[in-house]
Each structure stands twice: as structure tokens, then as C-alpha cells.
């Protein structure tokens, strides 16, 4: 069949409007295994197909794109880079986005190949066209261009090609297209900056990082909201955090939060700014961040008390992130009654908010209450027990009630809360003394979907593997848990049937 494809390709090359042949070729190439096409790669004459893309015939273009998508998979990246450079270049300026997408997918293969990427780095015009693809209307085309340029920049030669040539001017020209395109270029710059301190140095020298930071701390609230997401991405790296601290950016963000009370439009950017500090606290030290920037935790508690679901959601997420580490738990515990009030609000929202916010509350509670076996000191166990009881008059029944609601996502999130505390003795005593709770855990008929069965199994596993459960639940219940565990999450109990003599 591969030979048939080669024959049809020759036929297509001879004709001016080979629609019938293209339809036949499309059927053949989809049917031929890729390894057979690779064996015939040297015989695949692809340039005529690229030429047919330029004839302004929609069906012909669609057929050629479909055929090329398949055939180019059989061609080595180095062959693409060396022998089809001009075709790739023309593909990037083609009016049809499907052709640009095809071309960029092949460039994506080339830049992943250490030998082939050199060919692209030596082709200034091709690089320029990739840069200009960032400015197009089609988002997937722009994203593919950003991805290729990010990959190119992983090497020293790539950094030099992008930042020490006319390409930097092209990048700055593309930014002038509109606000959306400018943010796409910032996205590229942050992607590159996040790789290493050397990459960040190239980006800062270009002036583009400084430009982004000026927009972040400028007066336009919508621009702030967009820029903080990118700056947060940079802060995920150690060298990025160091740079932001040295440049005074973290202090500036803190000051903007301080001034947010007098800004009627702060709702646009506050969630992003608070998330920034939440991520910072987790990646560095919750205690250091909260001590150095007290306004951060102050604002989180204030947002938890808000009537705005967006603000509440961010506060809940941030508390969950902070409380995922022992150090973060200690920081929250030190705030005393302030945090108890937050826990009451979380419990209230878990019961009364929208489904999406309920799930976020439950996820936060799971993070806050979880302790690994080595963390289960008397102090920490006393703390998680106190936190649990602060959420409601009867927190166990609160979460059990949520788990009984007919929404799998809520059911799983509530089971995760029980799993988080399942190996803590105080929680086991609560579960055992709560009427019907042990039966609820053992009852397989409650869960109907895979995710719920998996979540219940994780709860059973956490209980069964606990050192204290046999003593607290009793041996018979412990053996039932072990049996559930050995049967697996999807076990179905056989139903006994009685044969009746004479029945059909």
C-alpha cells in the first residue's frame, strides 16, 4: 500500500487540479501503517503537495493538509529542516490557519531534535515568521509559535538568536499589534525566563521583563490582573523569586494590597495578588512570608469573611495551600480565634455555597486536617481535632451530609475529608461513636461511579492501615475493613439464586 501512495504522489505531481487523485491519496495514506511509510520516506515527493496549497482551492487545501499531516510523520526532522525549509517558511504566511498549524507542528518536531534545530537557528527568515505567528488572530497558531520559540530558547544558541539579533525588534513590533498579543509575548518571555537564571538575564536585558513589571504595578487594574498571573509563574522558580525580591517587586505587590481598601476596583486584581503570596509562602517559608508581609494573611482572613464568592474562593484556596505544610499549619494556629472564625466560615460555605465553591472548601479542609504518621504528635493531633470541631456544631455529620448529596464530585470531596483524618485517633473515635458511620464506610452500594468507588477505597485503606483502628473500631470491624481492602474498590457481592424445579 505504501507503494500505491508513492505512485499516487507521482500522479498528483503531474496534474494541475488533481482533486480525485488527492481524495484517493488521502484514503490510502490513512490506511498505510506509519512504519511502511517510513520505509518509503526517500520516495515521498512532498513538494508538489506544498505547491498545491497555494492554489486558493479550499477542498484542495484541506486534502493536502490532511495528507501532509500523515506523510510528514514518516519524514525525519533533519530531512524536513534541510529539504523543506522554503515550504515551511511559506506555510507560516499562508492565509489558511490549518496550513500554519500544520507547519508549526512540523517546526515543533524540528526544535525537539538537537541536530535539526541548528538548521532553524541559521534561518533568520523562518524564525521571523514564527515570531509573527504570535500576532495572528488564531490562538492555537499563536500558542504553537510560543511553544516552538520557548523550545528554541533552551539552548545558548537559541537565546542568542532570539535576543541578540533583529529578532528582538520583530518581537517588540509584534507586541504593538494589540493588548492580547502583547500579553502573548510576555507569556513567551516568562516561559523563557523560568528556565534558568541565565535565560532570565537575557530576558531582563531585553527590557521586556521590566516592561511587564511596570504594567503590573501601573494604574490599569485589568492589566494588573493579567500581569500578576505571569509574574506568579516566574515566582515558581527559585531564581525568579530571587529576582523579584531584589527588584523590590514583592514589596510593591504587598504595598498595593495594603492600599486596596481604598481602591473601589481592587476586586479585579486582589485575587491574583493574594494567590501570588500564597504560592510564595508554599515555595519558600510560610512563616517568613507571613511575618514579612502581614497584610497577606490579614487580607486572606478578610476575604474569607466577604460576601463575594470569588473572594471567598481565593481565601479558601489560599488557606488550603498554606495549611498543606506543618509550618503553614503552625502559622495559621498562631492567629488563634481569627482562624477559628475562618474555619466556621469554611464549614458554612461547604454546606451552603455553590457546588464549585463547596468542593474548593472540602479540598481546603482535606489539606488543613491531613497529618502524616510522623507528624501526629499530641500537639498537632489536638490542633486538627480543634480545627475540625470549629467548623460546625457536628462537623462529622456536616461532611457526611454533604457526601450523601447526589453529586459525585461533592461525594468524592467529602470522602477525601474523612480520608485526611482517617488515621488520627480522635477522628476514629468520632467515626465509631457516630451512629451508622461505620456501616456507611462499609456500604458499597452508596457509590455508583468509578471516581466515588476509588475515593471510598482510599478511605477504607487509610482506616485499615492505621495502627489504632483495631483498638478503637473493634476487631470485627477491623476484619471487615481488611476484607474490603483485599476485595478491591470494584468488588460486587455475588447474589445467591435458587433454582426452581420445572422452571424454564
From Swiss-Prot:
Pfam families: Proteasom_PSMB (PF10508). GO terms for cellular component: proteasome accessory complex; proteasome regulatory particle, base subcomplex. Keywords: Acetylation, Chaperone. The modification N-acetylalanine is found at residue 2. InterPro entries: ARM-like, ARM-type_fold, PSMD5. One of its GO terms (biological process) is proteasome regulatory particle assembly. It comes from the Eukaryota. Acts as a chaperone during the assembly of the 26S proteasome, specifically of the base subcomplex of the PA700/19S regulatory complex (RC). In the initial step of the base subcomplex assembly is part of an intermediate PSMD5:PSMC2:PSMC1:PSMD2 module which probably assembles with a PSMD10:PSMC4:PSMC5:PAAF1 module followed by dissociation of PSMD5. Belongs to the proteasome subunit S5B/HSM3 family. Rich in dileucine repeats, which have been implicated in trafficking of a variety of transmembrane proteins. Interacts with PSMC1, PSMC2, PSMD1 and PSMD6. Part of transient complex containing PSMD5, PSMC2, PSMC1 and PSMD2 formed during the assembly of the 26S proteasome. This is 26S proteasome non-ATPase regulatory subunit 5. It comes from Mus musculus (Mouse). The lineage of its organism: Eukaryota, Metazoa, Chordata, Craniata, Vertebrata.
Amino acid at each position: 500500500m505504501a507503494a500505491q501512495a508513492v505512485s499516487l504522489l507521482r500522479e498528483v505531481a503531474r496534474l494541475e487540479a488533481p482533486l480525485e487523485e488527492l481524495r484517493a491519496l488521502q484514503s490510502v495514506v490513512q490506511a498505510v501503517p506509519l512504519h511502511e511509510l517510513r520505509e518509503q520516506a526517500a520516495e515521498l515527493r512532498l513538494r508538489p503537495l506544498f505547491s498545491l496549497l497555494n492554489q486558493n482551492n479550499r477542498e484542495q487545501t484541506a486534502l493536502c493538509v490532511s495528507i501532509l499531516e500523515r506523510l510528514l510523520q514518516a519524514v525525519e526532522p533533519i530531512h524536513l529542516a534541510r529539504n523543506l525549509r522554503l515550504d515551511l517558511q511559506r506555510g507560516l504566511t499562508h492565509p489558511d490557519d490549518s496550513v500554519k498549524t500544520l507547519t508549526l507542528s512540523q517546526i515543533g518536531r524540528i526544535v525537539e531534535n538537537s541536530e535539526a534545530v541548528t538548521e532553524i537557528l541559521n534561518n533568520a527568515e523562518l524564525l521571523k515568521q514564527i515570531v509573527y505567528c504570535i500576532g495572528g488572530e488564531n490562538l492555537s497558531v499563536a500558542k504553537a509559535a510560543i511553544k516552538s520559540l520557548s523550545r528554541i530558547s533552551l539552548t545558548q544558541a537559541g537565546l542568542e538568536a532570539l535576543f541578540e539579533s533583529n529578532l528582538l525588534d520583530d518581537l517588540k513590533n509584534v507586541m504593538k499589534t494589540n493588548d492580547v498579543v502583547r500579553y502573548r509575548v510576555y507569556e513567551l518571555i516568562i516561559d523563557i525566563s523560568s528556565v534558568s537564571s541565565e535565560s532570565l538575564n537575557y530576558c531582563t536585558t531585553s527590557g521586556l521583563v521590566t516592561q511587564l513589571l511596570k504594567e503590573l504595578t501601573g494604574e490599569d487594574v485589568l492589566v494588573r490582573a493579567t500581569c500578576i498571573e505571569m509574574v506568579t509563574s516566574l515566582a515558581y522558580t527559585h531564581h525568579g523569586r530571587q529576582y523579584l525580591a531584589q527588584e523590590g517587586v514583592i514589596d510593591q505587590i504587598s504595598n498595593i494590597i495594603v492600599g486596596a481598601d481604598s481602591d473601589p476596583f481592587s476586586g479585579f486584581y486582589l485575587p491574583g495578588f493574594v494567590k501570588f503570596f500564597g504560592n510564595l509562602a508554599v515555595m519558600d517559608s510560610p512563616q517568613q512570608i507571613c511575618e514579612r508581609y502581614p497584610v497577606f494573611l490579614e487580607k486572606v482572613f478578610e476575604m474569607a469573611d466577604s460576601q463575594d464568592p470569588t473572594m471567598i474562593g481565593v481565601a479558601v484556596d489560599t488557606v488550603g495551600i498554606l495549611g498543606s505544610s506543618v509550618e503553614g499549619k503552625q502559622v495559621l494556629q498562631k492567629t488563634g480565634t481569627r482562624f477559628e472564625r475562618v474555619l466556621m466560615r469554611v464549614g458554612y460555605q461547604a454546606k451552603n455555597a455553590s457546588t464549585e465553591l463547596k468542593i474548593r472548601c472540602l479540598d481546603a479542609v482535606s489539606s488543613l486536617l491531613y497529618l502524616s504518621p510522623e507528624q501526629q504528635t499530641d500537639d498537632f493531633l489536638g490542633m486538627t481535632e480543634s480545627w475540625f470541631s470549629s467548623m460546625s456544631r457536628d462537623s462529622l455529620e456536616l461532611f457526611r451530609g454533604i457526601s450523601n448529596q447526589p453529586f459525585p464530585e461533592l461525594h468524592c470531596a467529602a470522602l477525601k475529608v474523612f480520608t485526611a483524618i482517617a488515621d488520627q485517633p480522635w477522628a476514629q473515635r468520632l467515626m465509631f461513636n457516630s451512629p451508622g458511620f461505620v456501616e456507611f464506610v462499609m456500604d458499597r452500594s452508596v457509590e455508583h461511579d468509578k471516581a466515588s468507588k476509588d475515593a471510598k477505597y482510599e478511605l477504607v485503606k487509610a482506616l485499615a492501615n492505621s495502627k489504632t483502628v483495631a483498638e478503637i473500631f473493634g476487631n470485627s470491624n477491623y476484619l471487615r475493613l481488611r476484607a474490603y481492602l483485599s476485595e478491591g474498590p470494584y468488588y460486587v457481592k455475588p447474589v445467591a439464586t435458587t433454582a426452581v424445579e420445572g422452571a424454564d
